Amino acid sequence: MKTKLFGLLMLAVLTLFSCKEKEPEAAMATEVSEAPDSSDYDKKVAVVRAFFQAHCDENIDALSAMLADDMKWSPPQYNGNQWLGKEDLLAALKSYHDNFDNIKYAEGLVMPDSTANGFWSGSVFPGQSADNSAGVLRVYGTWTAIHTESGKEIGVKYYNLSSVNDDGKIVQSSDYFDVNGLAAQIEAQE
């Protein structure tokens, strides 16, 4: 009888504690508590758009004016993850201007049935590092141009991470696109 009573008592205790509602965990504090600053995001997007337009216009002076003097740039090709500076980026852009005509940028993620937004910022996941600021812009699009020497039209899908400071200057930029794909398009036999 004592065994049955002890068993019923243990079952009651287990039921009581297992049915207790969990209290909210401190981890829930990662929820974004303030609304995102859309005007800050819009200003930074405008800077990057203007930078891309200056590249299309082959205006090296305008490009230089939009870059902070101490900006850091990561080129699209692998270089041991070494960050380069403003003059390196301007030299690369000047090389494109010297070798390509009719440089154009089409903003957005090309999907099977549409083109999605080309600028993103902030995050929801992972929760422990969720962020609703426009600190780093994620940029998606497609560049096209005419290779000057061969007359061939080239195109490349493009992804970039850019940061813009309070002065409206680009302070960090990391490019991702298929550099070798450009060469393959130029060298391809028709």
Feature map (PLM): residue ranges:
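C-terminal and inter-domain tail/linker signature
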Residues: 4-7, 20-190
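C-terminal motif of bacterial Sec signal peptides marking the signal peptidase cleavage site
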Residues: 15-18
